[in-house]
Amino acid sequence: MFGKKNLKWLGVVATLMMTFVQLGGALVTKTGSADGCGSSWPLCHGALIPEFFPIDTIIELSHRAVSALSLLMVLWLVITAWKHIGYIKEIKPLSIISVGFLLLQALIGAAAVIWQQNDYVLALHFGISLISFSSVFLITLIIFSIDQKYEADELYIKKPLRRLTWLMAIIIYCGVYTGALVRHADASLAYGGWPLPFHDLVPHSEQDWVQLTHRIMAFIVFTIIMITYIHAVKNYPNNRTVHYGYTAAFILVILQVITGALSIMTNVNLLIALFHALFITYLFGMTTYFIMLMLRSVRSDKQ
C-alpha cells in the first residue's frame, strides 16, 4: 500500500484530485451553491443523507465528497513519499504544508457554512487551497524528477530572475485573492464592459471597486509575468527547465486573461469561469516550482 512503486500514480491522482477541489470550490461559488446543505456541516440539512437533492445540494455535497477523498489521497501520498524519498530536502515540509493547508481549507469552508463569513474572509478560501494544491503538485514533480530527465537539479538561478520570480509569485497571489473576492462579492459583471467601460470610468459601488481592483491586478500580473518570461528566455536560452517552464507560465497567463475577458463578455459562462480557475491554479503551481528551484540555488550559494 505504501510501496515506492506507487509514488508516481499516487502523485498524479492526488494532483488531479486537488485540481477537482479547486474547480469544485469555484463551481460552488459561481452557482451560488454554498448554502446547498443549509448551515449544517459535516451533515447536510442536519442529516447524513438529505431528503431532497436540488442542484445546489448536489454541487455542495459533491464538493465536500471530493475534498474528503482528496484528503485521504494526499495523506496516502505524503506518507509514502515521507517513507521512501524523505531524504529529499523539500519532501517533509511540503508534506506538512499540503496536509495542514488542506485541513485549514476545510475548516474555513465549514466556518463559512456554519457562521456565514463575510466576502473578504471567504475570498481567503481559494488562496489557502491553492497553497495545498501547489504543495501536492511540487511533491509530484519531485517524484518524477528522480528520473533526472531534465537538468533541474543542476540549474542555478541568478539573483535577477529570483527577484522577478518572487515578485511574480506575490503579485499572482494578490490577483488570486481579488479574483476570489470578485466571485464572493457577486461582482463578476460589475463595472461594465471589458477592458474598461469607456462611457463611464468612475466606479459607483463596492462591486465596481472590487471588479476594477481585480482588473488592475490582472494587468499587473500579466505585465510582471511577461517581463519575467522575456528575461528568463533571454538569459537562460539553453536551459530547458527555465525555457519551457517560463514559457508555460506566460501561455497560462495569456489564457487566464482571455478567459477573464470572455467571462465578462459571455455573462459569466460557467465553463469559461471554470477554465479561468483552472489556469490560475496551474499558473501558481508553476510559480511555486520556480521558487523551489530558486531556493536550491540559494542553498548552493551558501555552501
From Swiss-Prot:
Q: Which principal EC class is assigned to this enzyme? A: oxidoreductase
Which reaction does this enzyme catalyse, per its entry?
A: Fe(II)-heme o + 2 A + H2O = Fe(II)-heme a + 2 AH2
One GO MF term on file is: metal ion binding
Copy the pathway line from the protein's UniProt record. Answer: Porphyrin-containing compound metabolism; heme A biosynthesis; heme A from heme O: step 1/1
Q: Which GO terms describe its biological process?
A: heme A biosynthetic process
What the record says about family reads: Belongs to the COX15/CtaA family. Type 1 subfamily.
Q: What is this protein called?
A: Heme A synthase
Record organism: Staphylococcus aureus (strain MSSA476)
The organism that produces this protein has a lineage beginning with:
Bacteria, Bacillati, Bacillota, Bacilli, Bacillales
Gene name as annotated: ctaA
